[in-house]
């Protein structure tokens, strides 16, 4: 179902409310340690400016549980960074509502940019943002003529700053970043070019059950590494030593393996250590030879070779979750090799990284520009891959 985007509406002299995801990591001194989420929103912001919008930006930042949290989670440094990136002033209003904000909005001229304070400051008073307080959504909606949602990172949440505003606006459209997320992830699930390979990793099966079930319906192969692989191995009768296993998920793992009809591939071997430690002694063990006092912390060389062979022929790949403890050098090889294999598909296949740790791994290895799409939403991309309807996508008008 085609969604309306910012390109489909008139912006000149319109007050444009734009929900962005500027939930960036901050250093102790308040400076921004990674501005990826800001740069990801630039195409939409610059498009709106170019078309003569009066732009009103807002986002959440961190979690606000006490009044003290406000001091360390202000969007002020974000506004300053955005101003540097777009080369024009960004008026920052340190409020989430009130006369100062209303007056500043009224004073905006075509091409001006304003940002107001962290939407979650409203959570100090009865979680108004996170619980989608109807009055708050209505108030924010009253500040603008049209609503643009460009925050995929919060698309799986129904908050006042997305769904609440949309419920009170005649026009709600997707920004260019949200459009890209819908096109890439939605396209992979609905109409993938084949072979379609899904690569899953991370620690727990329980985090990815629905993703596995949904991907088994559409993918040609599902490669599973990381900690979650050991629950599947245990379910097949292998002894996995001290490796991470979810005992309460063994029956489910068996069920998924049967359901997969050979689509799930776990490989052949693992890299083990005696402890979860960067200095532990490592060994390569086949699945049937993992000692009781060792734990698997990365996929082994034969598994790497098998995964690379499958990836090489793929036309669509979705990757969510590292293959090992890539933060430790001794257990980074599996994730590195998978990243490189996907980078080698550049220009030959669609490669999608589902946010979170996988995106961090791609960044660590410096291969971001070799991927078709790196999702800006961890939880949102996971729920999208589960086949769920995301509130922040559903609110967008249909063409």
Swiss-Prot record:
<feature type="binding site">
    <location>
        <position position="208"/>
    </location>
    <ligand>
        <name>ATP</name>
    </ligand>
</feature>
<dbReference type="GO" id="GO:0006094">
    <property type="term" value="P:gluconeogenesis"/>
</dbReference>
<feature type="binding site">
    <location>
        <position position="327"/>
    </location>
    <ligand>
        <name>ATP</name>
    </ligand>
</feature>
<dbReference type="GO" id="GO:0006096">
    <property type="term" value="P:glycolytic process"/>
</dbReference>
<dbReference type="Pfam" id="PF00162">
    <property type="entry name" value="PGK"/>
</dbReference>
<protein>
    <recommendedName>
        <fullName>Phosphoglycerate kinase</fullName>
        <ecNumber>2.7.2.3</ecNumber>
    </recommendedName>
</protein>
<dbReference type="GO" id="GO:0043531">
    <property type="term" value="F:ADP binding"/>
</dbReference>
<keyword id="KW-0963">Cytoplasm</keyword>
<keyword id="KW-0547">Nucleotide-binding</keyword>
<dbReference type="InterPro" id="IPR001576">
    <property type="entry name" value="Phosphoglycerate_kinase"/>
</dbReference>
<dbReference type="GO" id="GO:0004618">
    <property type="term" value="F:phosphoglycerate kinase activity"/>
</dbReference>
<feature type="binding site">
    <location>
        <begin position="355"/>
        <end position="358"/>
    </location>
    <ligand>
        <name>ATP</name>
    </ligand>
</feature>
<dbReference type="InterPro" id="IPR015824">
    <property type="entry name" value="Phosphoglycerate_kinase_N"/>
</dbReference>
<feature type="binding site">
    <location>
        <position position="157"/>
    </location>
    <ligand>
        <name>substrate</name>
    </ligand>
</feature>
<keyword id="KW-0808">Transferase</keyword>
<feature type="binding site">
    <location>
        <position position="37"/>
    </location>
    <ligand>
        <name>substrate</name>
    </ligand>
</feature>
<keyword id="KW-0418">Kinase</keyword>
<feature type="binding site">
    <location>
        <begin position="21"/>
        <end position="23"/>
    </location>
    <ligand>
        <name>substrate</name>
    </ligand>
</feature>
<keyword id="KW-0324">Glycolysis</keyword>
<dbReference type="GO" id="GO:0005524">
    <property type="term" value="F:ATP binding"/>
</dbReference>
<dbReference type="InterPro" id="IPR036043">
    <property type="entry name" value="Phosphoglycerate_kinase_sf"/>
</dbReference>
<feature type="binding site">
    <location>
        <position position="120"/>
    </location>
    <ligand>
        <name>substrate</name>
    </ligand>
</feature>
<comment type="similarity">
    <text>Belongs to the phosphoglycerate kinase family.</text>
</comment>
<comment type="pathway">
    <text>Carbohydrate degradation; glycolysis; pyruvate from D-glyceraldehyde 3-phosphate: step 2/5.</text>
</comment>
<keyword id="KW-0067">ATP-binding</keyword>
<feature type="binding site">
    <location>
        <position position="296"/>
    </location>
    <ligand>
        <name>ATP</name>
    </ligand>
</feature>
<comment type="subunit">
    <text>Monomer.</text>
</comment>
<dbReference type="GO" id="GO:0005829">
    <property type="term" value="C:cytosol"/>
</dbReference>
<feature type="binding site">
    <location>
        <begin position="60"/>
        <end position="63"/>
    </location>
    <ligand>
        <name>substrate</name>
    </ligand>
</feature>
């Amino acid at each position: 179902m085609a969604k309306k985007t910012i390109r489909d509406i008139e912006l000149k002299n319109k007050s444009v409310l734009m929900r962005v995801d500027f939930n960036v990591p901050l250093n102790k001194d308040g400076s921004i340690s990674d501005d990826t989420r800001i740069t990801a929103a630039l195409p939409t912001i610059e498009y709106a400016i170019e078309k003569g919008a009066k732009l009103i930006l807002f986002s959440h930042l961190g979690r606000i549980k006490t009044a003290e949290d406000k001091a360390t989670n202000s969007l002020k440094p974000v506004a300053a960074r955005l101003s540097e990136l777009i080369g024009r002033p960004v008026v920052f209003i340190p409020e989430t509502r009130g006369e100062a904000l209303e007056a500043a909005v009224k004073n905006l001229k075509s091409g001006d940019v304003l940002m107001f304070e962290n939407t979650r400051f409203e959570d100090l008073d009865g979680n108004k943002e996170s619980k989608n307080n109807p009055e708050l959504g209505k108030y924010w909606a009253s500040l603008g003529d049209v609503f643009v949602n460009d925050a995929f990172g919060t698309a799986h949440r129904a908050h006042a700053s997305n769904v609440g505003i949309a419920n009170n606006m005649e026009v709600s459209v997707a920004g260019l970043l949200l459009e890209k997320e819908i096109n890439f992830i939605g396209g992979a699930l609905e109409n993938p070019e084949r072979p379609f390979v899904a690569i899953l990793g991370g620690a727990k099966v329980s985090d990815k059950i629905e993703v596995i079930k949904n991907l088994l319906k559409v993918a040609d192969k599902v490669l599973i590494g990381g900690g979650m692989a050991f629950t599947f191995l245990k379910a097949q009768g292998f002894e996995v030593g001290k490796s991470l296993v979810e005992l309460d998920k063994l029956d489910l793992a068996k069920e998924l393996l049967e359901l997969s009809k050979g689509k799930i591939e776990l490989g052949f071997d693992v890299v083990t250590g005696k402890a979860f430690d960067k200095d532990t002694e490592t060994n390569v063990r086949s699945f049937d030879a993992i000692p009781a006092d060792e734990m698997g912390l990365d996929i082994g060389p034969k598994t790497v070779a098998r995964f690379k062979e499958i990836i090489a022929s793929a036309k669509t790949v979705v990757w969510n979750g590292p293959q090992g403890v890539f933060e430790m050098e001794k257990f980074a090889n599996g994730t590195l090799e998978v990243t490189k294999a996907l980078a080698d598909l550049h220009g030959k296949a669609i490669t999608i990284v589902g946010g979170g740790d996988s995106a961090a791994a791609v960044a660590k290895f410096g291969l971001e520009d070799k991927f078709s799409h790196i999702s800006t939403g961890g939880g949102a991309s996971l729920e999208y891959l589960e086949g769920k309807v995301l509130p922040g996508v559903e609110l967008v008008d249909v063409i």
